[in-house]
Amino acid sequence: MNRIGLLWSGLIVLAAVGHACAATLDALQGAWAMNGTGCESIFKKTGRGMEFRDRDSSLNTGLIIKGSTILGPLATFKVAQIRRKGDRLSAALNCSDSIIYGNLAVSFRILSPNKFERYAPEFPEISVIYNRCNL
C-alpha cells in the first residue's frame, strides 16, 4: 500500500470532529479498530491510555483519537474543519508522515457509542466500519 493509501486509511477516521462539534469529538475519543480486527493485536494499554503495539506496521488498521488529533498507521491527522449535514459529518484533515504533508476530506457517521462508519465524500457507498477498543 502506498503512502497516500495509508494516509487515506489512517484516517479517516474520523476524523472527525473538530472544535465545532465538541460533543461528537468527545464521543470519538479513544482507540478504534477496523471491523474484523482484534483490538489486542493493534493496541496495548499503558499508564497514559492506549498505544499502538507497532504503529509502523503496514497491516495496522487502528486509529487513536486524542483531542483534534487522529493517529493512524504511519500518519498523523489534525482536524482543520468539520461540517454536519443530517446524521453525517465531513471533516477537512491536515495529514502528515515523515515524508509527506497534505490535506484530506473524509466523512463519517456515528452508528452507536462504540461504532462509526468512515467513507470518502465522493464515494459514500464504499465505507469502513470501526469499533471502539476497551482493553
Residue ranges and their predicted role:
Residues 1-8:
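Bacterial N-terminal signal peptides that target proteins for export
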Residues 8-16:
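Bacterial N-terminal signal peptides
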Residues 17-22:
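Sec/Tat signal peptide C-region and signal peptidase I cleavage site
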Residues 29, 33-68, 72:
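Short, solvent-exposed loop/hinge segments that bridge or flank secondary-structure elements
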Residues 38-40, 94-96, 132-134:
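Sequence contexts marking disulfide-bonded cysteines in secreted/extracellular proteins
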Residues 60-112:
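Contiguous, well-ordered beta-strand patches that form the walls/edges
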Residues 107-108, 115-128:
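Short, exposed beta-strand-loop hairpins at the edges of beta-sheets
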